[in-house]
């Protein structure tokens, strides 16, 4: 007995869900267990593990040896090492200069920086099972601990809250049944680290917390995730398996196979691994798909069911493998030959190299026996309940794919068409697939393609056929794998009650290969999201909960945010988004995809890099992504095709009709672009989008988002798998590789937060309930105490370290390990209580046993006394006599009585026999009569019951028949409406598809053009920037030269004033005249050089334009014509007049061409009418031909029935049939020719229009260039004329001065002495005048800058005010539209308004706070409202499948009824769990209080945000008022400075022109907005029609479906409205912020300008008169040039328009007209032939008149149907007209956008030309400045020489030298003339510089306006494109709904027929029953 007790004690721990139950709820068995087990084991006994012990925990001796190693804590450190990462070392000397001398274990002495040292842990911390217990936590210590444990094959180690496992690359005996039993129910701290411990912890948390759990097993590829996943599933299957009893019966009924549920869960892995695992370079058994396995448990924790979700199978591996890799295991298992019957069935050999699809890499795997694996796979499928047919079908598809890969094709000679190179493989594949080999090859080689409304057979090249074969193979294998998973789920779904689940995630690990493609990006993106989830859960949410609960905690940023990389991949304009966008464009390629990637991310995202050049790479990399696990180079080859995943839509219908039922099932739901039939009903798995729109990346993102949602709704448990080395060598650890994985996985950070934080927490109520037993006296029962106070009091009464826990608002938090201490104390307390209880119970039992023994003793005493008394008297003599006499006393009397009794007995026996015989006879009669009565009564009752039931059923059937007839009638009417709508929508869809294709092409062209314009604009901006910088440098040099020159001018003026009387001025002026003439000649030479430079520039520009136009059609002729025109227009102005004459002639010719064009258009319309008539005639002929064919068939049948006809009649029939065949062929040829003719006409018309457009563009460019050259030439002529006039005036004044100077020569001698004095004064005045001149020039420049700033400030202010006003109007419109939308919703308006305000005011500052609140709500709901979450998930799934469920209306009703019954069951189950709900309500109440508090905090924050917005609005209004005030002040200042601002009139006029252009653009934008509003109205109308259709369908589905659909639709509309509100509010906020910033900048600029204007006011007044003359001259010149330019532009524009109209259309229209005429004649000839043939047919028809009479009835019916079709066609035509109007409107908007784009291009080109001109002028000014510099130096030298000569002249004058004085005077006059000329030159140069400055500013402003216009055009194009996409989606949805309605109608019709048949049968049966009843009752009534 004691032995049994000990054994049972060891197997019943006191930890688990049972400990939570109160004592009163314990059953009898649990009570007896508590009595027998007084204590639980505190530590696992290693002996329980058997031979597995040494792989999990070292023995005592080994640990003692390790822990007692001598150690010096101050000197032992870790130092970095190049080989082992870190090595152990000893410090030899202290730090000197930041370096320390250390000695390693191998006697090496190193000098290491002190910062690189890491302290070692004492030896007693070696081989730690939990690395969070280390004293020194660093990389080296963690690596050392893992390395030591791995060397002893201990692969599992705890790292804080999660577990780290290292792949051993060998089998270890740590997964046996004894190990599973040893870990069952153990605490984590009691057992060695193991994956079983983590699984058991999750299982116990599920039972204890009543919450769903998940286990995330992550790591790189080859880290051992799959093996650990299998072990976890094995553990759950064994621990939570169903026991014996009723549950066993339920399990047997659920599984329906020989295998139990736990066996099936375990065997699901081998089946999926065979089809989904393969060998890679890093892993021999790599999972090439992801799976999330949910294991469901019942309320008691027993196994209930399971299901599997799979993610992203690597389909490309089916047809391609890298060297060193292998395809999926199932191929090689089948080819292993272990089951020879498979080879025979699949027609396969045993050599994998015979099959291309599976032999591109290796074919074997070390340590893997493919034959044994095949047996395991087959056994697993048997356990999972696969039938033999299902297995054979599965194997056949795999074998067919092998044959599929061996199909070979070759190119036909002299053709691009491919043909089959042998059909053996195709025949085998078709045989296994159950299809026709000929149809399969025909579908591959000649697929049918849909062109408009018809199908055309298309030829394929060899490459296209090979690609189609590969795509079909990949799609078939992928669908086979998904079917396998769904089939396994079907088996594992046992329908047992389930309450919780544990999800196990096994996803493909992070991969970095030499060749990384689209699959690697998806896999690595998934791992990136999972790592971010780990970081968020471990670090961010953990610390946020501390803050939320009020824990004293400082937030630690661990720097592990992976969101930038995730945003790079999945956000809008991310990698996947760009990939999806490219997949929508038909002309997209890998190159365009790569270009978009670099345009959007190169240099903008730190995680996106260009690939580094590496010669070792075998494959090209196009970009690199910085992932958390490393930098991965990706190759984008084939990404577009992989993402679109197209299929040959001719072969798919062949598969759908396959004899192989499994293959037909796989493609049952496929609906491509060529499919016309709706998908079959009754299938649960539906596609959410059409096949052409559902890309692989979209599907992967949706599945990944679902997975992340499921994970967030669970409590996660993390297991980190580590790859020890790249070579898969057991026992070898690459330190750097392991360190890299530890850093990426956040292992150190997880240990750190586990040590510093509070990883364990409990609600106060839970803690009080569980641990009150530790000190019951602390919480008395007779008084009420709050749970928190009770917890504080209880913990305070215990002997614990009070720093190890903290109290939050709702929970108590514990440091790591403290909860384990409390559990041990609780176990001890429970052991003590149970010991006392056992003692009392055993005493009671022993006392009862003692009382029983006492009663037995008394009974024994009584028996013993009686026996002793008998023994005492038995030998007494009298007693012996008594014994002998007593039997003899009555013997005689007894004999007499016995004889009498015997006689009486004989008499009675005779009477009894007679009575018995009579009684038996009567009883038999009675029984027979009674039986007959009962039989008749029962028969009567049965007949009456049958009659009543039959009548009742008859009534019910009649009622149901009436109802169904009404329903059918209603559905028939609705079907007719739907068919009409469907036909209309189909026509509209086809029309829109064509229009959309054209619009897409136009949009592509626009995008290319806009991109080119953007590049040109950027180049122009760069040029303008460079020119601005050069202008600034020139300004500085000119200012410096001006100052120096002015100083020289002052000196020379003084000198000239002193030498006025010199006679030599005449000769000096003559020399000056000659010099000026020479300068004129120099200027003419420079002008010629500038012309040459300009011609070179023009030639370069023409070359660039030619390069740009090479990509367009017919550009060579246009370029040649343009070049010829440019050469002609460059010669002289006289040629312009000749060109004008030619233009007039061309105008006349253009008018004539216009007339001809109109005539040709009229002729084209006539031809179109003739074509329509021809079509009608063709239709009539076709109809007559069909009738004739039908009549001929009837005649032939009758003739055969009559018994044979004559040879002549048969010959006539054959002739008629031949004639009919010929007629049919000719009709088809005529139709094809007609269509080709129409297409050619349209194509030629489009080409002509395009050529005309190109000619117009070229002529416009020529006109612009001519205008520019003309204006330049006129300016040059004016300049030359001005120079000539100046020279003439100078010559006249020089002659006059000669006479004057001759008179004054006598006075010169007297003034020589005075000149000497004045020369000294001049030197002093020169400095003063020089400073004044510099100051004046500076003031002048400041004035000009202020003027330009004021003008720009005004423009900016006006623009900002206008933009603000427009945005306010748009915002008010948007608000009114939103209010209308909110009123239309059937939802609570107040709730929607609150959501609107919350979403509107939750800006960037509160976004993080709101996300935290959402996370809190999700966490609370996931913990305490599991059932509600489950129902929410079901509603979400129902919401997503709503559109697809419309195809299964009746099935949906049944599903809804089933759902109602399940809800009723759930309601009953919830009622039984009222106690748990009460507890959860208490928790929820506390949680709600916390959430209310958080909500109040959020409301306060939102109120603060709202207040800030109001303040900002008030500031904006104040700024606007200030702006208006500043505008008034600016106007006043300008009024005061009108004379100073006259120079800006030209700028104002140009600004006015620009404003007019802006207003025009604004009007165009408003028109576009109106058109967009009209499109919105159309969209709303379509949405209204859609909602009406949906409402009608929902009424047919029933009340429950109606309510559910309304709820889901409202939720969808709410989410859409919410998203729209978010987007609009974000746009408004951004616009407001931009306006605020622009306004602030404008105000600051105006303020600065105002201050500068105030300072410069006085200086401007002084300079006003001086500037007046210059400004007037500039204004006159500019006005003259502007008028000339305007006139030239008008003339050139008129000329270009006329040339465009005449030159483009003349030849083309004539050619088209001729072709149309010829085609019309040909059609007429064909019509005459057809008419003759029709006459022959009529003759033949007259012979068959009798047959036609029999078909007249059918013809009448056909006529009625034709009338019906005619009415439908009328409706279609009306709808077509409406759609054409809509499309015309869209086309108009696109044309407007294109026109605006062209205008922007012209402006950009004009800006480029102006910039080039500015560059030339600047170069000229630079040359002039250089010349002036040289002249300056020459003049300085001359001045010095003049001074020397003047001194000599003075001496000579003193001596009386007259000749010397004359020479000096001549020299002075010469210098004076040169100075005047230089002054004029400088003035002209200064004017030119100022003009260029103004021109540069104008160009900059114009470039900015062009950029804004381009941005607006791009926005308009994007909006139009989005509209087109939305309309296309709407039409597709409408078409799908129409197909659904048609299917419903057919189903309802079928049900009606069935009901009618059942009603007829029931009525017949009822009549029979009535007759039988009357027949049975009739005789009885007569009796």
Curated annotation (Swiss-Prot):
Signal peptide: none annotated. Residues 830-859 form the IQ domain. Transmembrane segments: none annotated. Keywords: Actin-binding, ATP-binding, Coiled coil, Membrane, Motor protein, Muscle protein, Myosin, Nucleotide-binding, Thick filament. Residues 1946-1983 are annotated as: Disordered. Residues 888-1977 form a coiled coil. One of its GO terms (cellular component) is cytoplasm. It is a peripheral membrane protein. Expressed in heart, skeletal muscle, testis, and all specific brain regions examined. Slightly lower expression was detected in ovary and kidney, and intermediate expression was detected in lung, pancreas, spleen and liver. Residues 72-122 form the Myosin N-terminal SH3-like domain. The keyword Membrane applies. GO terms for biological process: regulation of CAMKK-AMPK signaling cascade; regulation of cardiac muscle cell contraction; regulation of cytosolic calcium ion concentration. It comes from the Eukaryota. GO terms for molecular function: actin filament binding; ATP binding; microfilament motor activity. ATP binds at residues 219-226. Residues 126-827 form the Myosin motor domain. The keyword Membrane applies. Gene3D superfamilies: 1.10.10.820, 1.20.5.340, 1.20.5.370, 1.20.5.4820, 1.20.58.530, Kinesin motor domain, Myosin S1 fragment, N-terminal, Myosin VI head, motor domain, U50 subdomain. Residues 704-726, 806-820 are annotated as: Actin-binding. It is found in: Membrane. Residues 1972-1983 have a biased composition (Basic and acidic residues). Expression does not vary in normal patients compared to patients with acute monocytic leukemia. Involved in muscle contraction. Muscle myosin is a hexameric protein that consists of 2 heavy chain subunits (MHC), 2 alkali light chain subunits (MLC) and 2 regulatory light chain subunits (MLC-2). PANTHER family: MYOSIN HEAVY CHAIN, NON-MUSCLE, MYOSIN-7B. This is Myosin-7B.
